[in-house]
Amino acid sequence: MSDNLLSLENPVVPSHYELRLEIDPKQSSPNFKGSAIIHLKFNPNSTTLASIEDSFTQFKLHSKDLIVLSAHATIGSTKFDLKISQDTGKHLSIFNSESPIQLSNDCPLILSVQYVGKIRDIKTHHDKTFGIFKTNFMDRKTGTANNHVVATHCQPFSASNIFPCIDEPSNKSTFQLNIATDAQYKAVSNTPVEMVEALDSSQKHLVKFAKTPLMTTSVFGFSIGDLEFLKTEIKLEGDRTIPVSIYAPWDIANAAFTLDTVQKYLPLLESYFKCPYPLPKLDFVLLPYLSDMAMENFGMITIQLNHLLIPPNALANETVREQAQQLIVHELVHQWMGNYISFDSWESLWFNESFATWLACHILEQNGDLSHYWTSEPYLLQQVEPTMCRDAADVNGRSIFQIAQRNTGIDSQTSDIFDPEAYTKGIIMLRSLQLATGESHLQKGLESVFEDTKTFHARSVKPMDIWNHIGKFLKSQNITNFVSSWTRTPGLPVVKVEVEEKDGKTQTKLTQHRFINQLSTEEKDQLEDVPYQVPLFGVLPDGKMDTKNVLLTDRTLKFDYPILVINHLAQGYYRVSYESEECYALINDKITEETLSEIDLRKIFLDLSQFIGDEGFQNSIHLHGLFKILNHIASPSTKIASKYWDPLSKGLEVLQTIDRASLTSSKLQSFLKKKIVIPLFNKIDWPHGEFDKSTNPHELKVMSQVLFLNKNSAKCAELCQIYFKHLLQGPRSSVPLELVNSILVVVSQHCANIKQWKKIFDLVKRSSCTGITNHVINMYDQNSSETAMLIQNGAIESLGFCLDSDIVKKTLNFITSNIESEGMELALFGFNYNFKKRLNKNEKPQDQVVRETIWEWYMGNFDQWARKATRKGTTTGDHLHKALRSISLIIFQMFVADEPQKIEKFINLEKEKLGQSLLSLDDIWASVQQDEESRKTIRRDLASLV
């Protein structure tokens, strides 16, 4: 925090709060009345009070939007009258005593405060929910909007909107809440209701809640209002039974799935931690609005209701169920980690959230509700891979520890403190640590943490305190070193694997460095390259895990046996570069045997995709290794096992990148076709009739990629004409949607006359596409409108693949006439693949090259388009600005390899006309040049293999 911490500055800290709040949601005044009796004790961390024997005259508490009316303090029978002043900038109430206050070990300083606070009225999702807030909603019986729900949100610094306190996570106290409110309302808080007492008015009552365990102010909470509820009892360890309730303002029957999930997983978590659930009850309160979506208040979890009020028809969707369960169990984990054990700074929020997600996913997977999560696409491809790519793209990237050092103040919201990058890296770190340590060992280590209540519950701690404790318990320094390495070292490593035969023996050498994409020589020299603690997860050629070498802690490691793959199942946060022929030969052997995991093969291709085209990292072995695997899969003697279609599609994505880079060389293009594309095309069993509706979607993706890569082939064109006829004429469900784009591209590429082209051009009209949607096999259940749109976009993208000069002119005229329509620039897509080819007329080659025709068209229209595109604030201007940038990007790519001066001259002339930055042509050109450097790198090593 940027503000001075009261937990360090103040002579006293709270040990107990007794609160009475008077809340009437119906009243027009947006205020509540509050009184607090706060027990204060000597602060051993105080910078202003050396010891308990010293006296003081001033102390402070946080208070935001509170008007303190009066205050006094007592120690035993001694009373201290207090003067109150406000520091509104720092949100402090300052209490001054005329006589010195001398603390005693026997008697606390008891502060009594009367005050008034605000209740915020929340009407939309854009309104921020913090402190106490209320929402009115329609009574479904009367049809009037006079029902109310009042709730709280205290994280990170909004408890001080409810009562004067030290609103910092380092301070843990107990709480006893009393609420005076309308008798018609349900009232829920952290602890059970202990007593309900009628007040003078028969319509009001006082609800007294039991005293809480030690907890931070951020997880204090309550809710009152017109709430429906579901309730059950859950049996826990030791024949203990606790009530669990779900509250919501409406549709409470739709909360049954939430209740069932809590009933299943609360006992499982208690068993996992070997620590009793810390409270005598648990409630979920589902609210119409909640800015942070969910809040793990101790014993009273609040969640925005649309996440957990799930109607039966929605529960049929597996993804909906899994997301709801992840959310519920995540919040349940917090009852132990985050609430019972809490952290002394918001700098640890990443760990608190990462831990809850990691353990929730582990427990759900272990108990059959999140099948194969840690090897699933949502985890590996939607979380791990994008995070690694971002990390490798930033030479100035920060470690988790550095990210967490945020300059937060008392006005900060959770969104200001939470960092998704640190959170995701934290989950990955915990998962890899779990595997490296052993699931049962890590669980026992965590059990030992919860056993030590004096250290881990009586006070707030740091995450590293937990790992130091577990390391000592397991007698392993590697635990602490591992966590320290992954939290304090920025970026991610790449591990190079070299296998060689020496004196009749196999020797494997591993070398690690930090991995950064497109690193210049100067940046490489300045890069901090500290070795990571890398969990190897190695697999031996016999398929067993390598148990001899499990952790790479130094720069290099050598051992005298071969390794098949490391980072098995992609569970580690690093890239692997296989840099020996022997590595790829071994991989191919296991593909033949079908013993190589499909996830491992996909990971090999994913990592190669990061190396290929990277001037500072790519070498010829990466291209050779890719070709060796793809050629092996394409060979007639190798069967493509169904499990390999998915990784093969990733390998072909890398090949498409190489294919795009080789467009300037017919020799390189011929090499790729002959070595991989044609053998793969010949190997695939292409249906000449209807497709099997149960065909693997990944197989269909591979088919689509192979058709596109083989688009110049007459044999491919003949096949696609059959599919194109089925697309236009049927029968029903005869062409997979996944193949439509590639079919259209191949047909367009081989169009010989206007009549043929018009069949494709007709599909540019949405109405024509709508009429053929029933001819398409739709694997992903898009509706007919979505399917028609996809066919239409595919048709537009395919127009530019035709080489007939008359058709090219018609395509360009079509773009010109419709330039103000969304997506028309897509029609240029094909020209970018044929830009070096000669146009033909009546199937006879002409002198003019495609890109020369495109350039004449571009130059003839640019100034007119640019004038319109630079009219800011108009719909046409904004759209044309975007379209013209896209068109310029495509055309610049056609000349960057061999005529860059042409583009540079054009940009300089246009800047004189239009101004320096109206279209940012310099930025577009810089991006194109950067991409070309990557393509040059590919061509450099590709040429050496041809």
From Swiss-Prot:
Free-text comment on the cofactor: Binds 1 zinc ion per subunit.
Annotated GO CC locations: cytoplasm; extracellular space; membrane; nascent polypeptide-associated complex
PROSITE patterns: ZINC_PROTEASE
Record carries keyword Protease: yes
Binding-site list for substrate: 293-297
Residues with N-acetylserine modification: 2
The keyword Amino-acid biosynthesis appears for this protein: no
EC supergroup of this enzyme: hydrolase
Cellular localization per UniProt: Cytoplasm
Amino-acid positions noted as binding Zn(2+) in the UniProt annotation, renumbered to this chain: 330, 334, 353
One example of a Gene Ontology biological process annotation: ribosome biogenesis
Domain of life (superkingdom): Eukaryota
EC number: 3.4.11.-
Main location: cytoplasm
Subunit structure of this chain's protein: Associates with ribosomal complexes.
Extra remark: Present with 5110 molecules/cell in log phase SD medium.
The protein, known as: Protein TMA108
Gene that encodes the chain: TMA108
